[in-house]
Amino acid sequence: MFATKILRNAQSIKNELPHREVVKMAYDLHKPRSTAIRNLNENHEEPILFMHGIFGSKKSYVQDSKLISSATHTPVYTIDLRNHGESAHAQPFDYATLAADVKEFCDSHKLDKVKLVGYSLGAKVSMLTALQYPELVKSAVIIDNAPIPQPQIQLFMKQYIKAMKTVLNEANISADDKDWKNKASAAMKRFLPNGVIRKNLLANLVNKPPKDFDSPVIDFGDGQIHFLNPIEQMEEMAVEDVTDWPTELTKDLVFEGPVKFIRGLKSPFITDEGYEAIQKHFPNNEFHDLNSSHDILDQRPTEYVKIINDFFNIHRYESAPDSTILGHKDHPQTQARRSHL
């Protein structure tokens, strides 16, 4: 059994992800429990799109999304980015491609004035979507990330990958093992002592795939447990692409709509360089700092949800200003308005 598993893992490394310019992303739609808006449906003119972080999914913050939907009287789409959750496994995985997937989602669902919420990986996807496709975006909440390359976080990505590959390649946990999730957590612990991080990564570990879900590189019928992400194929993409940013592509792009940045004061993600880039690309910004690490959604769940609700409710009836393409020297900097909690 163990030798067979090693062979399968060696074979899976050779399998390349298919190349797809865009994929149709899996999603869940959360509607308000009660609303004054009649006939609220999937085509409501200003829905919220909630995008998860690396190795997250549309299932990561379901209750938070429901709370946001009801508090803002707005439908919330939680989406699976490619290579996550129930969305297709495909390359490439650069930010321009991920933003193109978001545009395809908006086009296919006839959404033309969306409000974006993005955390970590999803934050960068949200920022690039707003910069490249400003006609689609009214406003955004960006949770603890900045529009710059961040090689300093590659170490975190490598640790995540090591821990997940240990489960797949060394732990030898069968799908019918009743204690499979606890054993997987124990295998990951030496690389990831933080239990919250392990819990979030393990949310993508399954002993059977979702109904009607298939992967070109994962054999879900081999009797073993698997992550829903193509981990072997994503190793380089997670380390290189996720920590990168298309600087040349965005050097002259500015989004003029309102953007709230939620920053963790103990997080390394928004540096001074990142703060300057935010002022350049998103002049109509405001900051809200939380006493948190990068894991804001787990450490300060009530606070971040309230910040999102307040921001979207305040800007609900504003018309989005025209977004333009400007050089950095051609537009005034707007001093970020900071609030602390």
From Swiss-Prot:
Keyword Hydrolase attributed: yes
Domain AB hydrolase-1: 47-301
UniProt cross-references to InterPro entries, sorted A to Z: AB_hydrolase_1, AB_hydrolase_fold
MF annotations from Gene Ontology: carboxylic ester hydrolase activity; transferase activity
Top-level class of the enzyme under EC nomenclature: transferase
GO cellular component, one term: mitochondrion
Keyword match Transferase: yes
Database matches in SUPFAM superfamilies: alpha/beta-Hydrolases
Entry's family note: Belongs to the AB hydrolase superfamily.
Biological role stated in the UniProt entry: Probable alcohol acetyltransferase that uses acetyl-CoA to synthesize acetate esters from various alcohols. Not involved in the synthesis of ethyl acetate.
Name of the protein: Probable alcohol acetyltransferase
Organism (species): Wickerhamomyces ciferrii (strain ATCC 14091 / BCRC 22168 / CBS 111 / JCM 3599 / NBRC 0793 / NRRL Y-1031 F-60-10) (Yeast)
